[in-house]
UniProtKB/Swiss-Prot annotation:
Upper classification of the organism: Bacteria, Pseudomonadati, Pseudomonadota, Gammaproteobacteria, Vibrionales
Function per UniProt: Produces ATP from ADP in the presence of a proton gradient across the membrane. The catalytic sites are hosted primarily by the beta subunits.
Broad class of enzyme this protein falls into: translocase
Organism, as annotated: Vibrio vulnificus (strain YJ016)
Protein name: ATP synthase subunit beta
Membrane topology: Peripheral membrane protein
Length: 467
């Protein structure tokens, strides 16, 4: 094993000098000797003269020049397989749940090639979520990639938790949750919720259904940049065993942001809005690996923070290109008190095609969108002239659109503790029956308040009787 010594430290970036004959390769992991805790450096650049520039996978506090560093001769490798289930790990695959070593028999490198074109498989099987607006407007595919886009405080994490609750708990397969640069409190809450739901079994870890990898907000950029790859590597292993895996990533934007921080420290020139020049490539390296093969599938749900609610920002704009379904959360809908604040006019899915979902579903979804779009256009007229100036047909459109807006809301299981309303899971056929009836005018006599926060259309009819 070649040894070198630290010659320069700039925050999270460290330069290490090795003998000219033993210079480490890019992405090799280097272990720092004499550090109290395991400290790993990842080689990013070779500067010449035997010097390599690395990012620190941990805190560089207490590091000093002259400290010896050992080259492992391989990239960072993390434990994979069933031993990771029910455990919380950091970017290096070390347990951080105070329940002892992971003890996995196998380690995988976090840098792996994406599956070849021949190995990939197409996904058209639908994945029911139990959330009306998603199942109707932007249906998910099993083995597809789904993005939840939204600004700060609009409900990305709550929607993700509800999807985990509805899909992962009903789904017999395995899940991997990667917390990338999010709040430690959310990670802790998630762990305890998973225990209560029985998805994490502390007494019998082998019966657990989820592996968790956390690189939180307070950690150095190196950890936040690589933690998504660590989680993905664990998911890939389960997929290659022939299983159907769910991969949840919260939040992809923090992955981009960590890349921006590292890029600046490595001395690269920034590109648009200060992002790293390699933004599209870094995103591609991650996203191209999240795919289904002929052996098994990875269905991924990724939360994407939208800076200043601007969907044209380079980070969310780069993410859009890789997704099969995009769920866009809208602050104006949240301001009206309509949750989930999913925008039915902005959210899209490749699966919303008559050949995949069927003609009835397609027509219902497009009918809902047309009604809401017409209402949106009429809002300006209503604001200036009032409702009385509208034609009878337009008045009917407005009345139905307002009912549709309210019927798109529903109580969530994960929000039960805050709202006091029990959550509901709405099957797709019930969703279609309700919206089809609304469009056909079957419920024109029911007041719009009855449609707020109900599950099926039968609940709305019951609510109307109480009004």
């Amino acid at each position: 094993m070649a040894t070198g010594k630290i010659v320069q430290i700039i925050g999270a970036v460290v330069d290490v000098e090795f003998p000219q004959s033993d210079v480490p390769s890019v992405y090799d992991a280097l272990n720092v000797k004499d550090s109290k805790e395991r400290l790993v450096l990842e080689v990013q650049q070779q500067l010449g003269g035997g010097v390599v520039r690395c990012i620190v996978m941990g805190s560089s506090d207490g590091l000093r020049r002259g400290v010896e560093v050992v080259n492992t001769g391989a990239p960072i490798s993390v434990p994979v397989g069933t031993k990771t289930l029910g455990r919380i790990m950091n970017v290096l695959g070390d347990a951080i749940d105070e329940r002892g070593e992971i003890g996995a028999e196998e380690l995988y490198s976090i840098h792996r090639p994406a599956p070849s074109y021949e190995e990939q498989s197409n996904a058209t099987e639908l994945l029911e979520t139990g959330v009306k607006v998603i199942d109707l407007i932007c249906p998910f595919a099993k083995g597809g990639k789904i993005g939840l886009f939204g600004g700060a405080g609009v409900g990305k994490t709550v929607n993700m938790m509800e999807l985990i609750n509805n899909i992962a708990l009903q789904h017999s397969g395995l899940s991997v949750f990667a917390g990338v640069g999010e709040r430690t409190r959310e990670g802790n809450d998630f762990y305890h919720e998973m225990q209560e739901a029985g998805v994490v079994n502390i007494e019998k870890p082998e019966e657990s259904k989820v592996a968790m990898v956390y690189g939180q907000m307070n950690e150095p950029p190196g950890n936040r940049l690589r933690v998504a790859l660590t989680g993905l590597t664990m998911a890939e292993r389960f997929r290659d065993e022939g299983r159907d895996v769910l991969l949840f990533v919260d939040n992809i934007y923090r992955y981009t942001l960590a890349g921006t921080e590292v890029s600046a420290l490595l001395g690269r020139m920034p590109s648009a809005v200060g992002y790293q020049p390699t933004l599209a490539e870094e995103m591609g390296v991650l996203q191209e690996r999240i795919t289904s093969t002929k052996q098994g599938s990875i269905t991924s749900v990724q939360a994407v923070y939208v800076p200043a609610d601007d969907l044209t920002d380079p980070s969310p704009a780069t993410t859009f290109a890789h997704l099969d379904a995009t769920v866009v959360l809208n602050r104006n809908i949240a301001a009206m008190g309509l949750y989930p604040a999913i925008d039915p006019l902005d959210s899209t899915s490749r699966q919303l095609d008559p050949l995949v979902v069927g003609q009835e579903h397609y027509d219902t979804a497009r009918g809902v969108q047309q009604t809401l779009q017409r209402y949106k256009e009429l809002k300006d007229i209503i604001a200036i002239l009032g409702m009385d100036e509208l034609s009878e047909s337009d008045k009917q459109v407005v009345a139905r659109a307002r009912k549709i807006e309210r019927f798109l809301t529903q109580p969530y299981h994960v929000a039960e503790v805050f709202t006091g309303d029990p959550g509901v899971y709405v099957p797709l056929k019930e969703t279609l029956r309700g919206f089809k009836g609304l469009l056909a005018g079957e419920y024109d006599d029911i007041p719009e308040q009855a449609f707020m926060y109900c599950g099926t259309i039968d609940e709305a009819i019951e609510n109307a009787k109480k009004l």
